[in-house]
Amino acid sequence: MKKRIFAALLALCLTALTGCDWSTADPEDIFGTLTDYYNVEQKKQDVKLTSFALPYLKGETADPITCSDGAMQTLGALVYEGLFALDGQFEAQPALAESYTYDAARYTYTITLRSGVTFSDGSAVTAQDVVNSLRRAQSSARYSGRLAEVSDIRASGGAVRITLTGDNRSFVSRLDIPIVKSGTESSTFPTGTGPYAYSGEGGAHLAQNASWWQGKSLPLERIELTACKDTDSVSYAFYAREVQLLFCDLTGADDSSVYGSGDYTDAATTIMQYLCLNTRRAPFDDPAVRRAVTLGVDRASCVSAYLLGHGLAAQFPVSPASGLYPKDLETAYSQDGYASALEAAGLNTGKTRSLTLLVNQESSFRVSTAQTIAAGLSRYDLQVTVRSLPYDEYVQALEQGDFDLCLCQVKLTADWDLRCLLYTSDAADDK
């Protein structure tokens, strides 16, 4: 049975660092990063680069549906494309899709494929290629969540029909899922349609895809690939200047890859840190108290101190990078404003209310953030202490409602569907 939780969306909408997962960014972002490295007249560099190399995990698949996060997914952004691509404001722009229609009565999208598009081997992209990739994505760890409401995917001539279980007018924002050529899925580098293609001739590298349908000028003709055995060796290769681009996740449990000197490029993501309030316990069963707490977190300071500025403070569950973000409705943080709200909620009686803020101890970033939030909220009657637990115990406490406040993380879909936060039978944390 589903249980209702109240998520006070004291949000920190995160960016990823490319250059020191930009899983929601389009290839233009990484092209810009590559170009910057070669623009030595405008940037000071200790060493002028004569080649550019990216890491890959030896023995692991580059299949964009099943590959691991990080290095392999970064390569995939250069080799594969989806039906749509998200721009910098998270708006879906046609890529392999030329156009689409939506039948609201039948909850069905009909997507017409762009004509003349071929894979890097010269073979035509077909509707069945798209269907096969999307069906595989339905059962994958990375994409199954965003396709959970899909009831049917089928080819119809040169089009793809996707039927949903309910109405969703923004579903195409979820369809930046990479498409690979059917029958090549088991290859280490399946065949794609992107600007580059894998080649083993003369050493592992990415070569320009001569048949790329977009035909844009690319910053590099060849990108060398450096084999690494694991993420630690990827970090070492970056610091040794064997590779020139490193994916960094400042919020991960393992933050050993961060962060020395280098040039940083941010790409907005849909990852959101938020504070969950247990409305089944006092004092958060009182709407006035919940409103007060939303004013008591200095989001900007958390981003500055613990994300090194690589994030966006948000008061609503939408990235501020999105055109949908209601910036005009924001309330500026102030200690006086928080104090006034506590007084209005009757929490200035002198009687201490001890509360616990639950957090996953495996992320040092979240523990530090939780401690700062707890200190900021501890005013007048409220005294908030942090309870950090190993992940499994953290999830158990969250599912059992054994908390007053909880610092959580979620990766939203680009259509900003909040149902996973408002009604869920699982812990709202992705570790």
Residue ranges and their predicted role:
Residues 68, 98-142, 283:
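Aromatic- and charge-enriched surface segment that lines or borders ligand/interaction sites
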Residues 163-164, 168-222, 232:
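Gly/Pro-rich hinge or "lid" segments in bacterial periplasmic/extracellular proteins
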Residues 114, 207-212, 267-292, 296, ...:
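A bilobed periplasmic-binding-protein/Venus flytrap-type ligand-binding module shared by bacterial periplasmic
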Residues 285-375:
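Append "and occasionally in soluble cytosolic enzymes with long acidic Gly/Pro-rich linkers
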Residues 345-412:
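Ligand/substrate-recognition segments at binding pockets and active sites
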Residues 211-255:
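Ligand-site clamp/hinge motif
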Residues 423-430:
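Conserved small/polar residues in nucleotide/adenosyl-binding loops
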Residues 53-104:
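N-terminal lobe/hinge region of extracytoplasmic solute-binding protein
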